[in-house]
A protein has these predicted regions:
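Alpha-helical transmembrane segments of multi-pass small-molecule/ion transporters
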Residues: 1-335
């Protein structure tokens, strides 16, 4: 596992668990209407997060991988077509053993865009096509602002969870798209500053994610959503997440073989097409599921999937890098 990924696993995953424990110990503190005023803090935090995302998003960095349209099409189909269909199939099969909130959680997981940081990092470790990974992970994040609520409407009915689709899209435009556009407009002035302080901005972003997880679970504990659930719930979610991860990885491998991808494109496809963004998932949940008392339960499949994709990806990436290096050395020796 590479050093950046190891550091991310070392502190962030236990921190997520710690946020859940804190919510369980004193849910009234971080619940809606509590002393932390989370309903205001989260709205401001979400808008700041997407402003920073727009500020750090460099479209110039995408040009290196922009022309590989077969890779782009395969990744986006994996993220926004194969993944949602696989998740819908899992939910239909496991429906007798899942509550409505948990079914919605898996649908929500499957509708999310790919993650940027770990997709690109793992692709680099595995000696894959990094420009292609950067392009597709970034494109996926942009498309997700629109496609995620649309998939929720089609598969699970976000209208039933919050209101109507129109109001959800309005909230997304107001709290996500507008701040991101403002951040992009400020890049000529603040872009260099953001690049110098990228590590601090990423740390702030992760702290915001932890706060959003904490507040979501506070609401769930305050409404006694967890009453009647046991540790077997975590086991079931872990199994379901593992099944989805395996299905997507094998599907991406099959597509890569079908299209005749080389090692670089194959690695980028697998890592970008099989991953889901915890950051955007938690932040968008505060917009799409603002009035959902079981938001903590809805986010649980995403949190477990996030841990799974980091751990398994961290194991696979160096092995694939070694295999690619051995193959290159063998070809060089024959030549």
């Amino acid at each position: 596992m590479s050093a950046p990924l190891k550091r991310r696993v070392d502190w962030f995953l236990p921190a997520m668990a710690g946020a859940v424990v804190l919510a369980a110990l004193a849910p009234a503190v971080g619940a809606t209407g509590g002393p932390l005023h989370v309903e205001t803090v989260t709205k401001v935090g979400v808008m700041i997060a997407f402003f920073v995302y727009g500020l750090t998003l460099s479209f110039a960095a995408l040009t290196g991988g922009a022309m590989n349209w077969r890779l782009h099409l395969a990744v986006q189909m994996g993220t926004f077509l194969i993944f949602p269909i696989a998740g819908f199939g899992l939910v239909k099969v496991a429906a007798p053993w899942m509550s409505a909130d948990l079914r919605f959680g898996f649908i929500y997981l499957c509708a999310l865009p790919s993650t940027i940081s770990s997709s690109v990092a793992l692709t680099a470790v595995a000696r894959g096509n990094v420009p292609g990974a950067v392009f597709n992970a970034t494109l996926s994040s942009l498309l997700g602002v629109v496609l995620t609520p649309l998939w929720l409407y089609v598969l699970a009915g976000v209208a039933g969870a919050q209101g109507d689709l129109g109001s959800s899209i309005f909230d997304i435009a107001r709290m996500l798209v507008l701040p991101m556009a403002l951040g992009q407009l400020c890049r000529p002035v603040l872009g260099a500053w953001a690049a110098r302080h990228r590590a601090k901005l990423q740390l702030t972003d992760r702290c915001l994610i932890l706060f959003l997880i904490y507040s979501s679970f506070c609401d769930s504990f305050a409404h006694k959503i967890w009453a009647g659930h046991s540790l077997t719930l975590l086991g079931g979610i872990t199994v379901g997440s593992g099944v989805l991860f395996a299905v997507l990885v094998f599907a991406m491998v099959g597509i890569a073989r079908l299209l005749g991808f080389d090692h670089g494109d194959r690695v980028a496809l697998i890592f970008c097409g099989s991953k889901k963004s915890l950051a955007q998932g938690v932040i968008m949940a505060k917009v799409l599921l603002a009035a959902h008392p079981a938001a903590g339960l809805v986010l649980l499949p995403l949190m477990i999937y996030h841990a799974l994709q980091l751990v398994v990806g961290g194991i696979l990436a160096p092995r694939w890098a070694s295999a690619a290096l051995e193959k290159a050395n063998a070809q060089a020796s024959r030549g």
